[in-house]
Swiss-Prot record:
Gene3D superfamilies: Riboflavin kinase-like. This is Riboflavin kinase. It comes from the Archaea. Its EC number is 2.7.1.161. It comes from Ignicoccus hospitalis (strain KIN4/I / DSM 18386 / JCM 14125).
Length: 179
């Protein structure tokens, strides 16, 4: 994938795609007619079933998570779909470069969808949620479909205030296991 990105940046996306596809064929993950092989399916199944480890540093947010998690439309769905009553706030983590890249493998996992809703005439969007653990504490990684955060920032919700429960401060390193 990095090779493909390199070629795209050099201005030849067709060559990049062709080389990427050729490497997948050589690894016997794709057939000549671009179907996923049994070996390719096994690899995808492994990606889906294994937890993804993301590492980064705790950073302060702007308080928006507190606002959104005070809305009953989201709270109710978290209780129903994730099985916990969320603390009204998120823990923001600035991922290291390797973890930022690894975050894209979440597309192989099936998200829990918190549906959008309207409250007091205002529309709130969908949020993708993935069960997770932070230092052994139950949590969920949440990805709002509309966000101002850059890709290297993730937000975590939990039944407890993660900062307090884990004695975290800005700059502390954490590992998040996403299931």
């Amino acid at each position: 994938m990095l090779a493909a990105l390199y070629y795209v940046l050099k201005g030849d996306p067709y060559k990049a795609l062709k080389e990427d596809l050729e490497s997948l064929k050589k690894a016997k993950l794709l057939t000549e007619d671009l179907r996923i092989t049994e070996k390719g399916m096994e690899l995808i199944q492994q990606l889906i079933s294994k937890p993804i480890s993301l590492k980064g540093k705790v950073v302060s947010g702007d308080g928006e998570g507190r606002y959104y998690l005070s809305l009953e439309g989201y709270r109710r769905q978290v209780r129903e779909k994730l099985g916990f009553d969320p603390f009204p706030g998120t823990l923001n983590v600035l991922l290291d470069p390797t973890s930022t890249e690894k975050k894209s493998t979440l597309m192989f996992k099936r998200p829990i969808i918190l549906k959008g809703f309207t409250e007091n005439g205002k529309r709130y969007g969908e949020v993708l949620a993935f069960p997770a653990r932070v230092s052994g504490v139950e949590a969920a990684l949440v990805i709002p479909l509309k966000t101002h955060h850059p890709p290297e920032i993730i937000e975590l919700i939990s039944p407890v205030e993660l900062r307090k429960a884990l004695k975290l401060k800005d700059g502390d390193e954490v590992e998040v296991l996403v299931y």
